Amino acid sequence: MERNFETVMIEQCAPVLASLKPAGLFRYETSDCADLARRVRSWNEQLGEKGLCVRVLKGCVRTHRYLVYVYRESKLRTVLAQPQVRDFLCREGYTLPEQSDDYAPLLRQLSRRLCCEADFPHEIGVFLGYPLYDVVGFIENAGRNFTCCGCWKAYGDPSAAQRHFAQLNKCTTVYLRLFRSGTPIQRLAVAA
C-alpha cells in the first residue's frame, strides 16, 4: 500500500527538519518512479534554501521500494569531516575523499553498499547522526548488549540516550500534529 510521501517524511525525518539531527532515512513504496523523481526534485527546490537535501539512496523497480535520505548538508559535512568518523569509515572500507568536508563520494559509496552488498551497512548510523560510539557498539556487539533502545540502540549513558530519544520523539509528535493541522513542510523546516 502506497503512503503519502510527505507524511512519511514528517514521521521519519521531523528531527532533521527541526535541525535536531543531521539526517534521516525512510522507506517509501511507489510504483511510479517518475513521480518519486519529481517529488525529490521538488522537495530539493523547496527545502534547499533551508539547507536541506533529499535523495534516493536505494531503489528497486521490481519491489517498488526506495530508501529516501533527507539531510542537512552543513551538519552532515561536519559529522563526516570528524577525524574519528573518517578513521571509522576508512576501517569499514570506504575510500576517503581528499577534502575532509567532501561528503558526496561517501554518500555514493553508502548508496552502492545499500544496493549491492548482501549485508546491511550498519555504518549508516554515522550518516544518520547517531553517536559514533553507538554505531561502533552496535557493530561490535551485533546489536546486542545495548544500554538503551529508542530511536536506535545506544551503548553509552542510558539516561542521556533516553533524554535525547524523548526530545526526538517529542519533535516528531509536534511536527505531525502541526502537519496534520495544515502547516506546510516548508514552514516546519527551520533554516540551518
Where in the sequence are the language-model features?
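Internal catalytic-core helix/loop-beta-alpha segment
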Residues: 93-122
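A glycine-rich, hydrophobic loop/mini-helix early in the fold
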Residues: 39-101
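Non-catalytic, substrate/partner-engaging modules appended to enzymatic cores
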Residues: 93, 115, 136, 148-163
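Conserved catalytic core of nucleotide polymerization and phosphodiester-bond processing enzymes
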Residues: 31-34, 47-48
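Short, flexible, solvent-exposed loop/turn segments with mixed acidic/basic and small polar residues
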Residues: 12-19, 55-60, 112-116
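Long, compositionally biased
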Residues: 151-192
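Short, extreme N-terminal leader segments that mark the start of a protein/domain
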Residues: 1-32
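Hydrophobic/aromatic-rich, well-ordered segments within soluble, folded domains that form packed cores
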Residues: 120-147
